[in-house]
């Protein structure tokens, strides 16, 4: 799920995907789901860690609103530390502004 620059509100395209996937997420039992917040390289490391956390928290709050049990969901922020795309342009940055779902 991707985010606009310097934003943590969930975009309408991401809301649509989460709404469609909510039933599958509700059925997910056993194990833990980790929502990893990520940012592009712009901004200070401290700012990006906080922004990544706000992104992960926003996704968890939206999942809760959809009726997904959040007791086994954790959030973590990696800020700019784990880019998906190593480039240094808007195309790469857009891919790096994301929340990644990881199941353990």
PLM feature spans:
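Extracytoplasmic/secreted proteins, especially bacterial periplasmic and envelope-associated proteins
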Residues: 13-20, 46, 50, 54-58, ...
């Amino acid at each position: 799920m991707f985010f606009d620059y310097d934003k943590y509100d969930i975009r309408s395209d991401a809301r649509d995907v989460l709404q469609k996937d909510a039933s599958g997420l509700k059925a997910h039992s056993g194990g833990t789901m980790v929502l990893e917040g990520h940012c592009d390289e712009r901004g200070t490391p401290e700012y990006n860690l906080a922004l990544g956390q706000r992104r992960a928290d926003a996704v968890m709050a939206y999942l809760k609103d959809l009726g997904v049990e959040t007791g086994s969901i954790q959030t973590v922020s990696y800020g700019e530390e784990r880019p998906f795309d190593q480039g240094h342009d808007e195309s790469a940055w857009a891919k790096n502004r994301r929340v990644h779902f990881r199941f353990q």
